[in-house]
From Swiss-Prot:
Cofactor: NH4(+); K(+)
Keywords noted in UniProt: ATP-binding, Coenzyme A biosynthesis, Cytoplasm, Kinase, Metal-binding, Nucleotide-binding, Potassium, Transferase
Entry function: Catalyzes the phosphorylation of pantothenate (Pan), the first step in CoA biosynthesis.
Pfam families: Pan_kinase
Cofactor note: A monovalent cation. Ammonium or potassium.
Catalyzed reactions per annotation: (R)-pantothenate + ATP = (R)-4'-phosphopantothenate + ADP + H(+)
Quaternary structure and interacting proteins, as annotated: Homodimer.
Keyword Nucleotide-binding applies: yes
Record SUPFAM superfamilies: Actin-like ATPase domain
Name of the protein: Type III pantothenate kinase
Amino acid sequence: MILTIDVGNTRIKSAVFKYNTIIETAFFSNKNFQSEIENILNLNNKIKVLVVASVGKLEKEAFELFSNRVYVCFISRESTFPFQNNYATQSTLGIDRMVLSAGAVFQFPKKNRLIIDAGTCLTYDFVDENDVYQGGAISPGIRLRYEVMHNYTAKLPLLTLQEPQSLIGNTTNQSLHSGVVNGLTFEIEGYIEAVRGKNENFIIILTGGDANFLAKRLKNTIFANSNFLLESLNNLYQYQK
């Protein structure tokens, strides 16, 4: 059995794999990550491998304390990836974007792939049908958009995600919800159409914490999977061997 760990900007997500199938997932904070992982290992004593990717504050050393119980595989830019990297500044490319791109190559061979990760930030990554990573785009995610409008204005309230009642909001709160949710939806749809216009044999992969919410709003046919990064870590570990 394998335990994969995705250390994000705001939380940690994990998945336990048995025969390459997820049998359980969990979410927890950076503060109590050690006790949470120990609890998972205690409840699943057949776990032999811990696979980690981190864009958050926890680095490799934080997970080496588990090396007396399991083999720890820390995915980094020095790991082996199944694509050619054409990014101009490879040292700045987030490991989460690299892992997601690897997963797209593994699960959808010989296709042009656009991977959209809806988390703290919204990231777009494009890997072509020849397995060449070309780059993408980064913009604020849902929660960040709400927070920025509150933090950088004098009177706009801080709201949490809510489905807008209409396109044209008739209160300040509804205007904020419409701006965040509809604005982000239009952005994603527009980006998809721009990429589609230049590429055939095209698949869209939507993942991240807000994937399920956004999937219902998008007109395009997409493959939505909130566990895609965790699955990609499992596949990438197999690829290292």
